[in-house]
Amino acid sequence: MAKKIAVHRGDGHTMFILTSGLRSVRDKAITYFEERLRRNEHDLTRSYQAVNALAEEMRRVYNEDNEWLLKAGLHFDLHCIVGSQMTEDDAPHLFLLYPQGNWVEVSKGTPYLIIGETRFGKPILDRALRYEASLEESLRLGVLSFNSTEASSADVGPPMDAVVYRADSYDASEHRFGAEELEPIAQFWQGAIEHAVEQSAAPFAALARSIGLDPAP
């Protein structure tokens, strides 16, 4: 299965790009952007400049392909999450890039970004993920979010690709988690949810009585 994360390491900078949407559109835009990096790498010294460069290549692909996509009943739906620290950045940055080429940056008010199938994995992130969370806690929540999506969507499943970037390291560690690695987490999470439902009987007792139901023992 093709990775949906592209990691770029250069002289004094690191960037990773996560994507969702049509594979053909994604591959073309990333190819154009990688070629631009090879030609003009030293001109992109700030993260926002790199994101703007990727946005320009996305618009280029849109102008080339959108007419033909529409004729085939398809839509230009490429979304990207871009994390980077460039040579003149004083800290890492994380952006959500929309198909139109506009973007937003992560902040304390929005401690995570999510693309693709978002309906099922988003609730646990909204409830539990905080801007101050450690990388290890963020990984746990990310895996649980992935499992929640997998349980409710036939289009999502292992493997799961993960990237960790530490500030000022200018390097990123990557790992692809297979089904065997994720299965113990899936079993734990299923059991934890079932246990929480069982333990909810007492708080729900008054609600049950109010509509004529006998509370669980």
Where are these regions (language model features)?
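N-terminal nucleophile
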Residues: M1-P217
